[in-house]
Design a protein with these regions (language model features):
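FIC/Doc superfamily catalytic core
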Residues: 1-229, 233-397
């Protein structure tokens, strides 16, 4: 194949749909093109497909924006393990993806520390436990910890027929994966222990792979193997976040990744399907279609829960250092950052949600932080809505 033809095919908008490429360029041309990609550009991974052959990826064809990197490397000023606003959306979107009914009010109720009142809230509580577990960087990625994460977030809430056997880390029978156009079986049971050990070893390897790419590869491979009877997608998304937390991306749990997936979950499932369909044509499994999807539809669209600009933080930090911020005000400020992010709130709402301060204390806090330029205020009738961020005049309403 000459260079001009190769370049034309490489830049084709249907690059990751080899069946469409065949229609446009011919079966022979696409086969030769795929072979050249594998030989000259694809990087092998220490993971295998269902035939026991290595997975590959094309690192230069899934670009991550600089802004996405900055977002995930930003340090949330909240003292909490995760953003309440962001993780409310994360849990809500996860259940949307799985077609499980939930409400944001029930999710916030559980995240605020209340006990579950029904089966729906028990599932939410499981997600909360999972998020708390991966938020602790002392909880390293091991097969034992992965099993524990699965049990507390999902496994404990499944019907008996979908539960793992005692002392089993993975399923003991066949499973079929739904979500795409046609169901397909997961990895054969006897191969799961070896494949999952390789996956965990890969997560812990210092191999120079871009960490955001690697997180998405872990996400893909986990769901591809499907090690459980149920809850695989949910655990794959938690695994993705867990890896980013372990790698020092502090904003990962202040970012509702699953919201972007839920907005177009068909594209999410199609990315999986493209990997498998392309393998039938190319003769090897290239995970780049999933990486390309994740970079464009998730990473490059990220907006971490809003925090004040640097100048506002300096105002707060200076006041804190000078003893002008009380301990209760510090706790309230951290709660506001975590619970509301960029959302508006009222003093009554903050009193109800925070649960550990009198209304007079809440009122004094919002007035003081508005005067400092840390909160904006908007009057609507008899109500005042506050939001994190500075105002033009800094005067109280």
């Amino acid at each position: 194949m000459d260079g001009a033809q190769f370049a034309k095919m490489l830049s084709d908008k249907h690059l990751f749909e080899l069946n469409r490429m065949e229609y446009k360029y011919s079966t022979v041309s696409v086969k030769e093109f795929a072979e050249l990609l594998q030989q000259n550009f694809a990087q092998p991974l220490p993971l295998t497909d269902f035939s026991g052959n290595k997975l590959f990826y094309l690192p230069n064809l899934a670009q991550i924006s600089t802004n996405a990197m900055k977002q995930l490397l930003s340090v949330p000023v909240s003292g909490r393990n995760f953003g309440l606003s962001a993780m409310t959306e994360e849990i809500y979107a996860t259940f949307q993806i799985e077609s499980i009914r939930s409400t944001r009010s029930s999710i916030r109720y559980i995240l605020d520390g209340y006990a579950p009142r029904d089966e729906q809230e028990a599932r939410i509580y499981g997600m909360k436990r999972g998020l708390e577990f991966i938020a602790n960087r002392q909880n390293r990625i091991t097969e034992e910890n992965l099993h524990y994460l699965y049990q507390i977030s999902t496994g404990d809430y499944l019907p008996d027929e979908d539960r793992l056997l005692p002392n089993h880390f993975y399923r003991h029978g066949e499973v079929f994966i739904v979500g795409g156009e046609e169901p397909r079986p997961g990895l054969p049971t006897e191969r799961l222990p070896g494949a999952m050990k390789c996956l965990v070893d890969f997560a812990n390897a210092n191999d120079g792979i871009n960490e955001l790419h690697k997180a998405a590869i872990l996400h893909f491979a986990f769901a591809y193997y499907h090690p459980y009877f149920d809850g695989n997608g949910r655990t794959a998304r938690l695994f993705h976040l867990w890896y980013l937390v372990q790698q020092g991306y502090p904003a990962a749990l202040f970012t509702p990744f699953s919201r972007y997936i839920a907005e177009n979950k068909d594209a999410y499932y199609k990315a999986y399907e493209r990997v498998e369909r392309n393998a039938l044509i190319s003769g090897y499994t290239d995970v780049t279609p999933f990486l390309f999807y994740f970079c464009n539809e998730v990473y490059n669209r990220l907006q971490v829960d809003a925090v004040p600009p640097k100048t506002d933080l300096e105002v707060y930090q200076t006041a804190l250092a000078e003893g002008k911020i009380t301990e209760k005000e510090r706790l309230l400020w951290e709660y506001v950052l975590s619970a509301y992010g960029a959302e508006e709130f009222t003093t009554k709402q903050l009193e109800k949600d925070f649960r550990n301060a009198a209304y007079a204390t809440i009122r004094t806090f919002v007035m003081k932080f508005h005067e400092m330029g840390l909160l904006t205020a908007r009057k609507a009738g008899n109500r005042v809505f506050y939001r994190v961020g500075g105002t033009s005049d800094g005067r109280p309403l």
